[in-house]
Amino acid sequence: MNQTLSTIEELLRIPAPCPGPMGLACDGPDLWIGSYDTCRIYGMVAMQGRVFEEATAPGRPFGLTVTGDALRVVVGDRDDGGTDDRFIRRYIMGKDFKSDAIRCPGGTGSFLAYDGDRLYLSQRDAQVILELDDAGAVLRTIPVPRQITGMVIVAGRFYLVTTESRESDDYRLLCLDARKEEPEVHELASIPFAARSLGFDGTKFWTNCRGENTIVAFAKPD
């Protein structure tokens, strides 16, 4: 953990509705959680901890984001052996996954963010965010100084959970403004656990503490 940055201000922790929570997205007062272990997604009322919807994913779910009345979900192979091609799948809330799929560029990708117009995909090892068109073609590549383990767009800026490497326990919250020709990056806070995914409900951030099967809400740094 970084000793020079202030630590995030935790507001509450709630049990995850599943083991191995990986993906997370906010939809008003509701959370959507994807489980690496069960290969299912769960809709839950955050402050009640009540699951109101769940569905089997067509693979192992990673990052997800809300796009209107649907979710976009990065899905990988269930089998840990062999190749792990990643696809972006569409889940219609209250219904099921649709058959259409967009292959992630290079077959790899982890987390998603949506700005109301375009979809963005992170690639952890490449340390980039890819802006995608509707067909999944790359419109822009945004470099990031650290590996991304969660992201969300708030007021036009990317907020990122990051780490130095897969072996590091130094997790940090970054703000990246990519609207300028040269993206501006600011480190905001240290995160004292291995966080996965990032959502924002309008007032506070949410992330998964996968190792403890909990979901953590924390204050938005000034």
What does each model-found stretch correspond to?
Residues 1-17:
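A short helix->beta-strand "capping" segment at the edge of beta-propeller domains
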Residues 12-17, 54-57, 101-106, 141-146, ...:
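Surface loop/turn motifs at the tips and blade-to-blade linkers of beta-strand repeat domains
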Residues 13-36:
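Beta-strand-rich domains and repeat architectures in extracellular enzymes and scaffolds
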Residues 19-25, 59-67, 106-115, 144-155, ...:
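Repeated scaffold domains used in trafficking and secretory/extracellular systems
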Residues 33-38, 73-84, 119-126, 160-169, ...:
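Conserved beta-strand positions in repeat-built beta-propeller and related beta-rich domains
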Residues 40-43, 81-89, 128-130, 168-174, ...:
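Structural motif
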Residues 45-49, 92-96, 133-137, 177-181, ...:
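Short loop/turn segments that connect beta-strands within beta-propeller blades
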Residues 196-222:
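Blade-level signature of beta-propeller repeat domains, shared across WD40, Kelch, NHL, RCC1
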